[in-house]
Amino acid sequence: MTIEAAMGEEAIKENLEQFLIVLSVSLGVATLSQISSFFRQIPYTLLLVIVGLGLAFVDIRLVNLSPELILEIFLPPLLFEAAWNIRWRNLKKNLFPVVLLAIIGVVISVVGIGFSLNYFSGLSLPIALLVGAILAATDPVSVIALFRELGVGERLTVLMEGESLFNDGVAVVAFSLLVGIPLGTQEFSVTNTLIQFVTLQGIGIGCGGVIGFGISYLTQRFDLPLVEQSLTLVSAYGTYLITEELGGSGVIGVVTVGLILGNFGSRIGMNPRTRLLVSEFWEFIAFFVNSIVFLLIGDQINIRGLADNGQLILITIIALVIIRAISIYGLGTISNLITKQDISWQEETVLWWGGLRGSVSIALALSVPVMLDGRQDIIEAVFGVVLFTLLVQGLTMQTVIEKLGLIGDRAQRRTYSELIARRSALERVLAHLNAVPPSPSIRMKSLKTTKEASKGQLESRQTKKLRSYNNSYPQLRSLEQEQLRELTFKVEADTYAELIRAGKLNNNLSPLLQEVLAKPE
């Protein structure tokens, strides 16, 4: 064996060991946070950062990835999963405020944070603007989970999810346009920047659209869940790489293909079981990638450097909070003046305080070129902001929602659903008892007693509880109708999809059928 071959094998072995360490530690910590009642109170992402810091403190470095690889590995799955899960039908109703917050909001964040850091911390303007672009990307995953737990209104959830999805893409484009300025590889020009921005966006949307619709129609031709699941993974990474090669924004391409496959392809080309399989697959992928990213940021931090940059971190946090408030309340007012659906000041406050920073900002910070002076300052400033948003904003979010009176009726709806389920179960029990044939092993008296007991429980206890709930919470009366309506939409959409796959219905659907296929799950 040659020396080169031996060195190559040793490098592969070392990289594999590093990967297995990262895999074991990240999933181990994430799992611990779910099974322990004490750790369950702490966001698992925060636990991962703490473990990463601990490993860095004892000088155990987990893995060394090039900045380019960090973006190519971590961004596509995070963005695709977010785009796959957002429902276009809901997003379309709030598209204007979402786009306003995502595009103009990113510009305000980049300029506001950049000039604030330049003025108050002495950071050079190109580096400060780069920090602003990195921190323009919001990542409210834990806040959205809290929304669903507390029953916060659907519109507020869509606004926050939609803003996060689109501003991630815009922030990454802004980052790619600004990162060359401090390196001296490009000069800033408003005209050239706008042209480049439109070009990146256009190529990204075009590539994502072609690949998304192509895979959507391809999956109509077969019913192989694992192949369809694999195609979504290939589409996420493939779209990113192809779009980047063509000179566009891979991030915008991934967001586009995710929206198309999640809202169109999953309807016309996948049966319900496959859709569930793919959704669960991407839920795991996002969980896994988030785990690794938050572990790596802790691993990359220099403890002494973090303490030395305390003033820079504090200035960055203050600038971020103030600029975010200006952006949300200002753009919210503009949106209210133009659209008919007002965003209340309570909702604006939640959007402001819930704009956490997370995986995308961390991935961008870690992807800053190594040769750039001030790279470590950027990483530590971003880490400080992410830590603040997780610890302070994330942990106080429930209190803010409660004080603003935005908690919905989720708990009552859950109890009401359980009562309906109990009633259905008792009805099935009665139907089964009525169908029991005479048998020597079953005493008729016992059977009759059991029937009467079940019937009495159904007619008195369950009926009284449901009536009481209906009187106490009138808004719950439509719950059964909502569930039935959603069920009929699912059955109807699945029937059309089956007919299309069987060749009994034309691919070119009428607007009516397209609307049915676009109904949310």
Curated annotation (Swiss-Prot):
pH dependence: Active over a wide pH range between 5 and 9.
Subcellular location: Cell inner membrane
Pfam families, per the entry: Na_H_Exchanger
Keywords annotated in UniProt: Antiport, Cell inner membrane, Cell membrane, Ion transport, Membrane, Sodium, Sodium transport, Transmembrane, Transmembrane helix, Transport
InterPro entries xrefs: Cation/H_exchanger_CPA1, Cation/H_exchanger_CPA1_bac, Cation/H_exchanger_TM
Family listed: Belongs to the monovalent cation:proton antiporter 1 (CPA1) transporter (TC 2.A.36) family.
NCBIfam families: a_cpa1 (TIGR00831)
PANTHER family xrefs: NA(+)_H(+) ANTIPORTER NHAS2, SODIUM/HYDROGEN EXCHANGER
Protein name per Swiss-Prot or TrEMBL: Na(+)/H(+) antiporter ApNhaP
Source organism per UniProt: Aphanothece halophytica
Lineage of the species this protein comes from: Bacteria, Bacillati, Cyanobacteriota, Cyanophyceae, Oscillatoriophycideae
UniProt gene name: apnhaP
